[in-house]
Amino acid sequence: MQFANLSGADRKTMQAFLAKLNGQQHRFTVQDHSYTLSGGGGGTLQVNGGTQSGTSLVCDGATASVTNYLKAGDYIAFNNELHMVVADTNSDASGNVTISIAPPIRKTPADDTIVEYTVPKGVFMLAGPASWDTQTDITSSFNIEAVEDVLA
């Protein structure tokens, strides 16, 4: 991630954030700010059944009978896990939907776990040291690399 041309308070906030992470010791939640839902969505999506694993997630609570409820390339999040929808998905007349996802489910979600699809976020950690460049105390640019914490 790049944060360019930060000055004053923004620069100090970023430096404090990075110091607080203490390398890979602490985690942070992040979303893709360029992401927009391309499917129709609607309703309060919840896990339907607490014994799920693999690359499909069965849910209920969707708005009924929506073609392209979620589309390939959309994201969902549950249990602090971020997943990409890999196939277009329709909801049925009862508001049920089966979502094909990648990567596979890592921790079996409990029944009725909320599935976030409008602003999905994942838990990340730094992949290595952060770096920044300051231009004569006017602005700073930061570069950080992060990986999803698959054990969160």
Annotate each predicted stretch with a short phrase.
Residues 2-152:
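Extracellular/virion structural assembly segments
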